[in-house]
Amino acid sequence: MMKFIKKEQIKNLGPNSKLLKQYKSQLTNLTSEQLEIGVGLLLGDAYIRSRDNGKTNCIQFEWKNKAYIDHICLKFDEWVLSPPHKKMRINHLGNEVITWGAQTFKHEAFNELSKLFIINNKKHIINNLIEDYVTPKSLAYWFMDDGGKWDYNKGSMNKSIVLNTQCFTIDEVNSLINGLNTKFKLNCSMKFNKNKPIIYIPHNSYNIYYELISPYIITEMRYKLPSYEGTSKDYNKIH
């Protein structure tokens, strides 16, 4: 019987290391939590890709918030071999932008997520994705990844939320909206940002949405939420 190999044993080994290959081979599937989170991340900015025609896949992450990417790497700990790396660039306004990048190693375990989001090497939304695969935890990671306030004016009482879905087609965003409204009893609609579709969750749906996602929003990302009048017993609970 092959001895179980711990992640600490394979740090700094080359890609062709026998021990590294044994470590990868002992992993089989993502956990149910990793699948839930993965769906939420891929609805946002994370990307899944294959370099061997779909035999294996890996997920790539890049965000400005260091605490958030550290949290994600911890959630996918056994699949991430290197810590987040700092990336610097100059934007179109001439300002320095710092982000943090990380990725999992390629593995068959990520193929399940690839089947949900990738068609002909491009990101897509399958029919009934929300109804069949999205949970409140998925919603929370989708929001942390690519959501925000509709109204950023200081002191605003507007609790409307936006999910930035500009990378998807109008039909795909409509499918997401229908799923959200049906499964989670929200009242979402489509709006446009620079002629690209986004999902608008109105003020009157916010309390429902908040109670769904609040248990899973990490402390460092709660600034993205509008103020909330009420309490949640799970406010600081992180799964």
Curated annotation (Swiss-Prot):
Signal peptide limits: none
Location(s), subcellular: Mitochondrion
E.C. code: 3.1.-.-
Enzyme class, spelled out: hydrolase
Database matches in InterPro entries: Chloro/Mito_RNA_Process, Homing_endonucl, LAGLIDADG_dom
Any single GO BP term: intron homing
UniProt-recorded name of the protein: Probable intron-encoded endonuclease I-ZbiI
Organism: Zygosaccharomyces bisporus
Family: Belongs to the LAGLIDADG endonuclease family.
Record keywords, A-Z: Endonuclease, Hydrolase, Intron homing, Mitochondrion, Nuclease
Function: Endonuclease involved in mitochondrial 21S rRNA gene intron homing.
GO cellular component: mitochondrion
MF-aspect GO terms: endonuclease activity
